[in-house]
Amino acid sequence: MSAPVCAPGRRFGGIARLYGNEALTRFAAAHVCVVGVGGVGSWAVEALARSGIGRLTLIDLDNIAESNVNRQLHALTDDFGKAKVAALHERIVQINPACEVVEIEDFVSEENLPALFRRPFDFVIDAIDQVRVKAAMADYFVRHKQPFVLSGGAGGQNNPALIQSADLSRVTHDPL
C-alpha cells in the first residue's frame, strides 16, 4: 500500500513556520546518514523524516527483537525478526513519501569505513554502541571533513538532568 502524496507545504508547514521556507527547501535537498538505527537512531530517523529531510541512508545489520520494544520506535509485534532498516524505511515513506531511503544492512567496522562513506553526506549521525568503531568513525569523519554528530548511551544513568553536552575532547567518565 503506498501513501498518498500531498504537497510538502501542507505536510511540513509546521517545519517551514519554525525554520522558514528556505530551511525547508534545504532539508528537502539534504542527504543524512544514520549509523545504528536502534534505541537512539530509530528516534533520530523519525525526527529527520518528520522534518522533511529528502534522502536518508540507514546503516544497521540488526533485526527487531521483542527486547527492543521498550526503547526502539520501530519495535512492534508484527515486525519482530524484520531488519531494522527495512522497518524504518516503511515508516519513513508513510511520513514522507517523497523521501528517498537507502537501506544498508551492514555493521560499520574500521575496515569498511571507506566503502560505506566514500561519498560525503550532508550529515552523519552516529548512533552505535561500539566504542572502538565510534572512535574510528570520528577519526575518519574529521580527516575527511564529514560533518557528523556522535551520540553516547546513558544506560544505567538515572538523572537525565545531569547529562551535559560537550566537545568529545572535554568529555569525562565515558570510554571514548
PLM regions: where:
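A structured beta-alpha segment of the ubiquitous adenosine-cofactor-binding alpha/beta core
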Residues: 81-122, 128-131
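Glycine-rich phosphate-binding loop and adjoining beta1-alpha1-beta2 segment
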Residues: 53-96
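Conserved N-terminal Rossmann-fold NAD(P)-binding element of oxidoreductases
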Residues: 34-36, 59
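Hydrophobic/small residue at the entry helix of a nucleotide-binding pocket
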Residues: 40
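E1/E1-like adenylate-forming module used to activate ubiquitin-like modifiers
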Residues: 123-176
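N-terminal charged helix/coil linker that caps or initiates catalytic domains
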Residues: 1-33
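Aromatic pocket-lining residues of Rossmann-like dinucleotide-binding sites
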Residues: 48
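Hydrophobic residues within alpha-helices
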Residues: 44-45, 88, 137
